[in-house]
From Swiss-Prot:
Keywords, in A-Z order: Disulfide bond, Neurotoxin, Secreted, Toxin
Family: Belongs to the conotoxin M superfamily.
Subcellular location: Secreted
Single Gene Ontology MF annotation: toxin activity
GO CC list: extracellular region
Disulfide linkage: C1-C13, C2-C9, C6-C12
Superkingdom of source: Eukaryota
Name listed for the protein in its UniProt record: Conotoxin BtIIIA
Domain free text: The cysteine framework is III (CC-C-C-CC).
Chief site of localization: secreted
Keyword Glycoprotein: no
Tissues in which the protein is found: Expressed by the venom duct.
Length: 14
């Protein structure tokens, strides 16, 4: 779970 620029647990940094 990456929450850098996302509000929910999304693969935004994966």
């Amino acid at each position: 779970c990456c929450k850098q620029s996302c509000t929910t647990c999304m693969p935004c940094c994966w």
